[in-house]
Amino acid sequence: FPGFTEDWEQRKFKEFSKKTGKKNTKDLDFPAYSVSNKAGLISQTEQFDGSRLDDLEKTNYKFVEPNEFAYNPARVNVGSIAFNNLGMTVIVSSLYVVVKMSEDLDNEFILQFIKSPTFIKEVKRNTEGSVREYLFYENFANIKFPFTRNKEEQQKIGAFFKQLDDTIALHQRKLDLLKETKKGFLQKMFV
């Protein structure tokens, strides 16, 4: 970005992250969430069409605190990784990996990186398994990413790409609405 002159280097996530996700052993009543490859963190009630989850055994679930990342190690290769920007603690399946990034990293910058084709390529290089491939934390920690010490530059880059994502989403909604309108007109016209 213009105005920034600090060097960039390739660093590994293990230098800036730690595995978190304590288990909900006391069966505390936190909302249960899943990680979607499209919507990020999504309420399990919403994901499963309003099904009642009150009787769900939640003692094996893991906490995801605000500003932590969670991912499905068997589906991260298709984008099942999310950032908790909900402003509240939630719980996720015990199968998920929960990660806290260092204060040296801007979370939006990292979120944009983990949506990138470069990250997905690195995921594929670092997975384990023959039938179903998994990205365990130890493998995630070895993935390299572009790093600058200038957090302000990280923030500007993250905000730039977030704004692009928001604009794309807005236009996608408009496109979907136009398609539905066209479909309605066609149905009325050719009845």
Where are these regions (language model features)?
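Short amphipathic coiled-coil heptad-repeat segments
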Residues: 1-6, 10, 173-191
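Non-catalytic DNA-recognition/assembly elements of restriction-modification systems
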Residues: 1-25
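A short glycine-rich beta-alpha junction/loop motif
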Residues: 90-95, 128-153
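DNA target-recognition patches
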Residues: 21-54
